[in-house]
């Protein structure tokens, strides 16, 4: 299947000069969504994984069915204040300010092998923060998977030597 034909391009969103890749059009197509998840699971089949972690919010949409298909647990990396229990937090720099990701204490145990899943690799800031958060818990990132990688933004430079797999590579 040509997954790129299922991704809508929205120019100048969320601000002028940005070409936003909207995955909701792929998600609305049941066949395309299933095949995309199956293909991502296939890309990750050689990773030795205990749990899948995914950042809010679109990471949840891909991470949950992948965890189910792979028979693994799912760990949600949330924005601040969204978790009801005690959380571990990691703050990171955005273009215009700071943000944070949090995970429940004990959701990722020391030594857990973690596959990090998100929808789009653009600047790499969110996923790099996810890597640092997982490391804070004692977990080990064994791979990172994306539906889409936007080329030309050098995001992989922020991810070090972690194995990265992507279903689609599109121009930014």
Curated annotation (Swiss-Prot):
The record's gene field reads apt
Top-rank taxon, per record: Bacteria
The UniProt similarity line reads:
Belongs to the purine/pyrimidine phosphoribosyltransferase family.
The record describes its quaternary structure and partners as: Homodimer.
HAMAP family, per database record: Aden_phosphoribosyltr
Instruction: Provide the protein name.
Output: Adenine phosphoribosyltransferase
Physiological role: Catalyzes a salvage reaction resulting in the formation of AMP, that is energically less costly than de novo synthesis.
Q: Which PROSITE patterns match?
A: PUR_PYR_PR_TRANSFER
Q: GO terms for CC?
A: cytoplasm
């Amino acid at each position: 299947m040509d997954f790129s034909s299922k991704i809508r391009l929205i120019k100048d969103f969320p601000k002028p000069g940005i070409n936003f890749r909207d995955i909701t059009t792929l998600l609305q197509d049941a066949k395309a969504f299933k095949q995309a998840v199956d293909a991502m699971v296939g890309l990750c089949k050689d990773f030795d994984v205990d749990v899948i972690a995914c950042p809010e919010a679109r990471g949840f949409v891909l991470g949950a069915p992948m965890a189910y298909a792979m028979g693994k647990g799912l760990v949600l990396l949330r924005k601040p204040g969204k978790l009801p229990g005690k959380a571990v937090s990691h703050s990171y720099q955005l273009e215009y300010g700071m943000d944070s990701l949090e995970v429940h204490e004990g959701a990722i145990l020391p030594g857990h092998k973690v596959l990090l899943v998100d929808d789009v690799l653009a600047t790499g800031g969110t996923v790099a923060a996810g890597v640092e958060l997982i490391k804070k818990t004692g977990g080990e990132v064994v791979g990172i998977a994306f539906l889409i990688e936007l080329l030309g933004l050098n995001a992989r430079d922020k991810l070090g030597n972690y194995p990265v797999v992507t279903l689609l590579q599109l121009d930014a």
